[in-house]
C-alpha cells in the first residue's frame, strides 16, 4: 500500500472509532417544518379483501437483531400461513414512546415500503398493530450491513465500489421516480443479502411526494453525508441523494469521509466551503465521477439534469456495467458474506443477538391509539396470491445458531458430548448428539488461548456450501473454548478406506483425485489455500465410498487472500491491490496444496508413500528425500501403471513450486480427462498401518520446518479494537 493509501487507512480507523462511539447517543431532534404539527397518523389500507391479516402470534421470536429507545428488531420465523417457515426481520415500535417526530417517521417508512417494489430495496411483507405496538415485517438480510464490511476491510477495490454503486443507483432512481427523496444514505442503511447484493433500508427520514419543482426544507440525515443545500436549509430535491451517493463512493474507495470535522459545526462548515482533497491513487474515471457528484450547486450535480440517473449510468466509471443484467441480479457480487444456515446472525452486533428475544406487552399511548394509527395493517400482494412450490422456500426448524461472539447458552445445553474422534495440538474433535433431535454430529473444540478460530469459521461459513467441503452447523463460544459443530464423517479417512479396500484401481484413483482437485480449484479460485491437505483431513461423509461423499476437512491452517489493509480479495482484483510478496506466498501455498495431493495420488497408485519408508524414518531423512525430489516411478505397481499417471504425479510433486501443476491444470490433464479408459485392474498395497505411519512421519517432518510468522486477523490489531465502538446516528431537525 503506498503512502497516500496508508494515510487514508489511518484516517479510516479514527473515523470508524468516532462514528461507532456516537451510535449509542441519540442526537436526533425534530422540527417538522414540512409536515406541520401531526395530530393523527392516517395510513390507508393495503390489505386485499378475503386475506387474513397477520398478528404477533404468527411469528416465532428467534433473536434480537437491534434495539433502541423506539423498540426492537427481531429475527422471526413465520409459523402460520402459506409462508410458514419463512424468516423475516420484525421491527416492533412502542406507541407510548413514539413522539410526534417518531410517529411521522413510522408513517413515512411504512407508506414508502408498501409502495416500492425493487430488487435493491428491502421489502415490506406485513404491517400490523396491537393496542400498544406497531409491527413491520421485512426481509431478513443475512449478510449484515455495508458498514460492517467496510469497518473490517478499511476500503474496497474500485471494482467492488462500482458494483455497489451501480445497484444503489438503480435503487435511488426507483425512489426518485416515485417522488421520494431518500435523505439518509450511509453504509449502515445498506444491507447485503446472502449472495452479496445490496438492499437499502430505513426510510424513516425519507420525504414522499416530491417532484422536481418542489423542495423539502428539513434539516435531516447524517451530518457527514448531508448535501450543502440540506445543511444550509435553503431547500433540497432528489439531487441531495446524489451528493450522499458521492460521499459513500469516496468513503468506500478511500476508507475515509470527505468532509469530517472535530464536531458537527466544523463538519457542516467543511461541507459548505472546504476544497476536496482528491486521492491520487484513484483512477481518473473515479476522480471524474466524484468531482461531478460533489457540485455544491445542486443544479450542476450529476444526476440532477433532465436525464436523471442516465447521466450517472453514462459516466466512464460505469462503462463496464450492463445495467439490464445488473437489474436482473445476473452479475456476480464481488463479495459473498460468510453465512451458513438461514437463521445465522454472524453479521449482527452480538450486543443485541446475545439477548433473550422477548416482546413484552406494550402500553397504549392513549385510549384512541388505534385511531391514531388507523390503516397501519398491510399484507404484501405477493403473499395474497397463491404461491407456487418453486416460490415457497420452506425453512426447516433448526435450533438457534449460536454466534462466535458468545451468549448465555452453553454448548452442553443443546448437545451431549461423546467419545473422542481425533486430538490435535490446539483442538480435540468429539462425537456429539443434538439433544432435541437426537442427530449425531462432530464437534471440534478449539482452545482459544492457542489459536484464533476466526479465519477457519469465516472460510467454513463462506465456502462450506460446496458439496465436497465439510459443513459447519453451529458455533458456540464459552470464553475459553470455541465449539464448531459439523457434519459427522461416518465413512472415515480416505486413505484408511482405500488401503483396506479389496479392489482399488488406477481408474478409481483418478476419480478420487478429480473430486478433491475440483474442490481445491474452487477454493484457490476464491483466494483460499488449505495448507494442511494431508490424507487424514480428507474423509468420507458415509459408508458408500463414492467420490461424491468425499469431504475436505480441518481448515485450521487455511488462509483467505487479503491485501495489506486486511481487505478480503476477490479473484479478479488481486493484481492491483495485493503486494507481490503476498501473491507470491499465496501461490506458494496453493502449490503446497497440489504437492499434498501429489503425495496422496502417489500413495494411492504405488501402495506406499514416496518419501518415507515407514514410521521409523527420521525427519532429517525424509526432508532430505523431499528436497532432492527423487522418488521411485518403477517397480511394483508402477510397472503396470499408465505413463499418463506417472506424468501427472511427477508434475504435481515437482520440487520447484513454480513448475508444479495448478489445480486447473491437473483437471485438464489427460489422465483425469480420459479416466474412463484407465485400467480397472487391482493395485497391490502395503500394510495399512505401515503406510499410515510413513504418511504421518512425512507430515511430522514437514511441520518441524520453520514456519512463516503467523498473521493475526485484522480485527485483533490495536487499531481495529479501538474502532469497535458505535456507529453514526441520523439527525432530524
Swiss-Prot record:
CDD domains: STKc_RSK3_C (cd14178), STKc_RSK_N (cd05582). ATP binds at residues 65-73, 91, 421-429, 444. Gene3D superfamilies: Phosphorylase Kinase, domain 1 (3.30.200.20), Transferase(Phosphotransferase) domain 1 (1.10.510.10). One of its GO terms (biological process) is oocyte maturation. SMART domains: S_TK_X, S_TKc. Its EC number is 2.7.11.1. Disulfide bonds: none annotated. InterPro entries: AGC-kinase_C (IPR000961), Kinase-like_dom_sf (IPR011009), Pkinase_C (IPR017892), Prot_kinase_dom (IPR000719), Protein_kinase_ATP_BS (IPR017441), Ribosomal_S6_kinase_II (IPR016239), RSK3_STKc (IPR042766), RSK_N (IPR041906). Changing residue 311 to K: In a metastatic melanoma sample; somatic mutation. Residues 59-318, 415-672 form the Protein kinase domain. The keyword ATP-binding applies. Its cofactor is Mg(2+). It catalyses: L-seryl-[protein] + ATP = O-phospho-L-seryl-[protein] + ADP + H(+); L-threonyl-[protein] + ATP = O-phospho-L-threonyl-[protein] + ADP + H(+). GO terms for cellular component: cytoplasm; cytosol; meiotic spindle; nucleoplasm; nucleus; synapse. Activated by phosphorylation at Ser-218 by PDPK1. Autophosphorylated on Ser-377, as part of the activation process. May be phosphorylated at Thr-356 and Ser-360 by MAPK1/ERK2 and MAPK3/ERK1. Residues 319-388 form the AGC-kinase C-terminal domain. Forms a complex with either MAPK1/ERK2 or MAPK3/ERK1 in quiescent cells. Transiently dissociates following mitogenic stimulation. Interacts with FBXO5; cooperate to induce the metaphase arrest of early blastomeres; increases and stabilizes interaction of FBXO5 with CDC20. This is Ribosomal protein S6 kinase alpha-2. It comes from Homo sapiens (Human). The lineage of its organism: Eukaryota, Metazoa, Chordata, Craniata, Vertebrata. The gene is RPS6KA2.
